[in-house]
Regions:
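C-terminal catalytic histidine-bearing segment of alpha/beta-hydrolase fold enzymes
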Residues: 221, 225-271
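Primarily recognizes the serine-hydrolase "nucleophile elbow" in alpha/beta-hydrolase
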Residues: 108-180
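The conserved beta1-alpha1 loop
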Residues: 59-61, 113, 212
Length: 271
């Protein structure tokens, strides 16, 4: 059967650039270097369309011991089709380095992306930082310290790591003594030195949207509520969405209605 159809373009195509090196860390007895990489997904440019799109920087979790920048990217296609670029960022883990190098890496990635905004077709003044679990902790910490230089190392220091909105999913907030994964990983001392990120909360914090499941048996709902309450008390803008019955890293977090709520927050808060 032969058909001729007329197709109405309702959403953009999506393209992916993987293996982008944004920095490096010393390795093997400080005698060699290992690359720090990100993957960048964005709407495919079309004739007459705006080229510089807003950016979501995404951080996956992994108990501070492992990270995979691409593992959640299939779920992020939804946002790319709504007109956003998404950068999945690898960061240092505690098996290789000491904290706060993971936060330093993420802030370096943000500055790198700002420095290369024209090249990648992104708007360096419209950046959202979003992450889950351990990545949610780093998301909140980096979002709260964007206006100071505490963790700014590695290059591109003529740019700041400031972002315009912060969206941590089921984040760790007060870490001291917590087990990340039952019977397997306990937070090392160098992380617990930064045990309570509410100490970084100020009135000038960027807008926050916190997502947490009421049934989270790994990172209790009280952790997300602690961050929300701290932001509210400081006079900063904060929203919180509690997913009834949702566990840690639950599939509920990637359902269309939840993504739509995230998008609504982003569209209201980006300049």
């Amino acid at each position: 059967m032969k058909q001729t159809i007329r197709v109405q373009i309702r959403e953009p195509g999506v393209i992916l650039a993987g293996e982008i090196v944004y920095g490096q860390r010393r390795a093997w007895g400080n005698l060699s270097y290992r690359p720090l990489k990100l993957s960048l997904m964005r709407p495919r440019p079309s004739s007459g369309a705006a080229q510089n799109v807003p950016l979501i920087v995404w951080l996956c979790g992994g108990a501070f011991t492992e990270v995979d920048r691409d593992i959640w990217l299939p779920e992020m296609v939804w946002f790319a089709k709504k007109g956003y670029a998404i950068a999945g960022v690898d960061y240092s883990t505690t098996y290789r380095t000491r904290f706060p190098e993971s936060a330093e890496d993420v802030k370096l990635a943000i500055r790198f992306l700002k420095a290369h905004a024209a090249e990648y077709g992104i708007d360096g003044n419209r950046i959202v930082l979003m992450g889950e679990s351990a990545g949610g902790y780093i998301t909140a910490l980096c979002g709260l310290t964007g206006k100071n230089r505490e963790f700014d190392t590695g290059g591109f220091e003529n740019y700041t790591s400031e972002v315009q909105a912060v969206i941590p999913w089921y984040p760790l907030v007060r870490l001291s003594g917590m087990k990340i994964e039952p019977d397997r990983v306990t937070l090392p001392h160098d992380i617990t030195a930064y045990a309570d990120i509410t100490g970084y909360v100020t009135r000038d914090a960027p807008p926050f949207l916190i997502l947490h499941g009421s049934g989270d048996s790994l990172v209790p709902l009280s952790q997300g509520e602690l961050l929300y309450d701290s932001l509210q008390k400081a006079g900063a803008y904060a929203d919180m969405i509690v997913l009834e019955g949702a566990e840690h890293a639950d599939t509920a977090f990637v359902q269309p209605e939840v993504k739509a709520l995230i998008l609504d927050f982003i569209e209201k808060k980006l300049p």
